[in-house]
From Swiss-Prot:
This is ABC transporter A family member 8. The gene is ABCA8. Residues 586-823 form the ABC transporter domain. CDD domains: ABC_subfamily_A. It is found in: Membrane.
Amino acid sequence: MADSSPASFLTQADALLRKNLVFQKRNIWSNIRLITIPFFLCLLLLVIQMLFDTQFNDVHGQCGCNEKTCGLRYSTSEQAAFCAIPNPPQWTPLLQIPAPEYRAAIPYPSHTSPATFLFTGNNQSLGNILMGNMYSNSSGFDGDLAYYVLGSSSFPAYTNHMDSAFISDLPIYNIQHECSPNSSFSILIHQSPLAFPKEVNCVQGLNLWRNSSSDVNNELFKGYRKGNPDKKINEFAGAFDFQNTNGNNLNVSVWYNSTYKNDTVVRPMALIRVPRLVNLASNAYLEFLKGSETKILFEYVKEMPKPETKLSLDIASLIGPLFFTWVILLLFPVILTTLVYEKQQRLRIMMKMHGLGDVPYWIVSYTYFLLISILYMLCFAIFGSLIGLNFFRLNDYSIQLVFFFICINLQISVAFLASAMFSDVKTATVIAYIYVFGTGLLGIFLFQFFLEDPLFPRGWIIAMELYPGFSLYRGLYELSQSAFAGDYRGIDGMKWRDFGNGMKEVTCIMLIEWLLLLGLAYYIDQIIYSRKHPLFFLLQSTSKKKQHFSDNKISKVVVEMEKPDVCREREKVEQCLLKSTRDSAVLCNNLKKVYSGKDGNPQKLAVRGLSLALPQGECFGMLGPNGAGKTSFINMMTGIIKPSSGTAFVQGLDILTDMDRIYTTIGVCPQHDLLWEKLSGREHLLFYGRLKNLKGSVLTQAVEESLRSVNLFHGGIGDKQVSKYSGGMKRRLSVAISLIGSPKVVYMDEPSTGLDPASRKSLWDVVKRAKRKGAIILTTHSMEEAEILCDRIGIFVDGSLQCIGNPKELKSRYGGSYVLTVTTSEEHEKEVEQLVHNISTNAKKIYRTAGTQKFELPKQEVKIGEVFKALEKAKTMFPVVAWGLADTTLEDVFIKVAQTS
């Protein structure tokens, strides 16, 4: 038994989900191609990686060997970095001393310029003592480098397997209070199997007091090339802030030049020579407390053992941000064009008019896109891991899961939001791909440049990350850098403990944007698509009552200007409105639609205060010339546009406030067929039947009956895809869709357009049966169709209802004459005209062309028999090719009303 109640949320969601699954099944190969895109892109990365490996993996990119043995002794300086080091060497700890030409000095640096240290604190005298304890006063070399304060101006290495200071041509510096002749000496550094002779040159250590840490910061910054107007480098060796240090407490902050770490994309971060600075401050304090004999010797720094390696370049991690941005964003055009296609083809409004609510549509559509995106990203990550891409293999998979999940949800939200701005698929597609490729290019050439610039304000970075494409790029950049560094150092990539390196920031931004943009997209959809008031969630029922009251006042102004039958219809409507219960299927109360003028044009009154009462079981026909307002009326009744004033009630529900409930009771056959080409006729009816709350055997039976009624059952036509249907078959399917579920009110816009006579007659029988169960509003240009189907007809001209009544009443009211048609040769037209005036003195010629003339003969002046006698007599006087006498047709009534209005 059929359930007449509206379909529940779950029923609507089930109907849409089933339809989408069938539709995607028909597009299975397109979906497979989409899912396999990551596989081929990962293969492309693998090929690029192999090409780079082939280029780099020659003898210069690996440890040197003789016939059987590999090691440092068989390696060149280029090959030594790749050799295994089971017992790493011990290197004397050094300070980072500026090169002579860059040292802070007045008036300008030279090779004798001192290495300057700034210091500050709460107690200047204590600071002077501590800084005085920093350097040794020994002269000559006693064999133990740990007692000397040594430094180098060479750039530090990335590991301590080989200290660049001892293998470079630059000297080692011995920092002294004052340089004596014996302060410089030569040493030989033994690191089996190698030995490095080095010159140790004395450099004076100059300590300068500053009053505050702010002064220290200011002077350090001015020593930077961009920190002074002369663009000169005046570099300090270091700085100390002893703060509240006293005899019971050591509290010191150390400044050092962090630019030596070379933390760029081109090469990994170097080890900065900071430990010796901390050791100097500690030993200076110990000497202050215990005397000069108390020291903690910092004897050496030593790297962890390393295996033999080969020169490799993780190209996938290096180009990952650009490449992976494009890969992930390729889903955006797919989602956007799908949403815009449904809007362009008006498929969504068709579903909405048959009862599909906005919430089920959003949830099912969003879930579908989310599942496709998840499957896409899973394939991407799995394929990337299987072929060994470090981006996936080294970074924590749980971090990738969280990041990609938030990312694809944000992308879907952006697509829903963007779909409100487009009504054409081609335009949306072009803009979407510009967004995809433009984001990648701007990311690598603009955003990444600012991201790696340490002077670029962090606030601006966050502002740029508000653009979803840049937030995606930033996350991929962080993952790529972690994978690259992990591969270089032989460790894992990003772990949760590393999540604060920018990843946390961008993940929070994307999460917040996902929720905000999704809510904004739904709000805009309600405003633009569902035509709701911008403050629809705040409106109260009082506005509704106020609107109805004003409408009733307006209606009295226009009554006197209307014709009697139209006035009677308006009075009927007003009487119905006064009743507590409204039995009419459709009740229009002074419905008006005004389109605002554009480009200086005046306003367009499309519908001028229409009042109409349509009872159950009636078929009402709307006739009128193009532009009369019929389509605007249908669009208002189906919720596509809002009335400028007035309202209408469908089954007692107001179109201004209850449109969602009205959709569950109506059926619509639009002027143009709104169908899915990949679905069959049966699948269309099953979908719309479920929206009408039909289930089980009732649904199956209703679909079978619908297919039979419109001649789409036999020969398996109903199971063929709509793309194989003719225009007439599609039209019949549209009619069947509008009638399935026995809706209480059906709107049919030219339902028989494009049908052959047999199909048209069959369709008329279907409509006749349907009106027994509800009311039908039908627009047509076929007078025959209107006369056969419609119980009442209304003729619209220039937005106004000019007359209303059943076909016989209208023909009687507007057609009190016969139409006489006579065809002769042109030279006898005068004789024909004289003959007609002899029959009726008030005869009126309404048509003339090439010897054929039409005349209107008032019925009260002529008898049909006299007309026959007169024409038979005329045949004896001049040749009459043809003649005919006809009663007034509905078409004549239509033409007369249209011309006189």
